[in-house]
Amino acid sequence: MKHFSTETEKDTVLFKTPFSPLYVRCALKNLKSTRILCMTALLCALCALIDIFYLMIGGAFLRIYFSFLVAGLLCMISGPFLAIPAGFLVDTLSFLFSGGDPAGYFPGYALSSMLSFLIYALFFYRAKLSLSRLFAARLTVNVLINVILGSVWKHILYGNAYIVYFISGAIKNIAMLPIEAALMLILYRRLVPILQRMRVIPGSVEITVQRRDYVFSAIAGVIGVAVLIAYYVYKNR
């Protein structure tokens, strides 16, 4: 186990995985930090507000939301223990800001939001960030939460076959992955230095991009566009 001579040195350490006693202590420390709590509350409100807006492509075929960008930043700052209640708060506020859903408030979406925030925190909190890591985090959320769990919730609420929601959700979420990862990279590279000056994330956090990341992103982008076009043509033939 590595020992740190000063508290400052401990506050700047990054972790390869969250499975460390020091990682847990650092995350728990955020529960007592006024600065972190205030920033988390502010980003919760911003995330919920942005969540009610979206871009629509191809009629009702594809909706592009941007709240995941704020959610990732929030979890990068707050850590896993704050991220879970933050996810619940964001879902509740989003429901209220949007004027409610005709089907009423559904707790399944609150669970999805809490799990999504936890995943982002495990990937981003006190970690060395890269395009591959951003892509992996978004892939995990898209597949496990948006596709698998989301299809269950839609089946419960609207009654159509699970496989119908699963197939359409999988195609849309996988096709959007390269774009979403690129947006995260562009935004976070601009905002990380600002957050460091605000002292809400360690100064040692950085975002690196290697040549293989560009190659991987290009391939993923081509596949995503091809899948999206093929599905759109199939649905409108």
Regions found by a protein language model. Give the residues of each.
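Alpha-helical transmembrane segments of multi-pass membrane proteins
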Residues: 68, 72, 110-117, 177, ...
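Membrane-embedded alpha-helical hairpins and interfacial helices in multi-pass inner-membrane proteins
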Residues: 4, 52-66, 99-107, 124-237
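Hydrophobic transmembrane alpha-helices
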Residues: 2-77, 81-82, 86, 102
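Hydrophobic alpha-helical membrane segments of integral membrane proteins
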Residues: 84-89, 108, 133
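Interfacial segments of multi-pass membrane proteins
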Residues: 78-79, 90-98
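Hydrophobic transmembrane alpha-helices of multi-pass, membrane-embedded glycosylation machinery
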Residues: 88, 92, 186-187
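Alpha-helical transmembrane segments of multipass membrane proteins
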Residues: 48-52, 72-73, 92-96, 118-122, ...
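Residue-level recognition of pore/gate-forming positions within transmembrane alpha-helices
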Residues: 44-48, 90-91, 113, 142-143
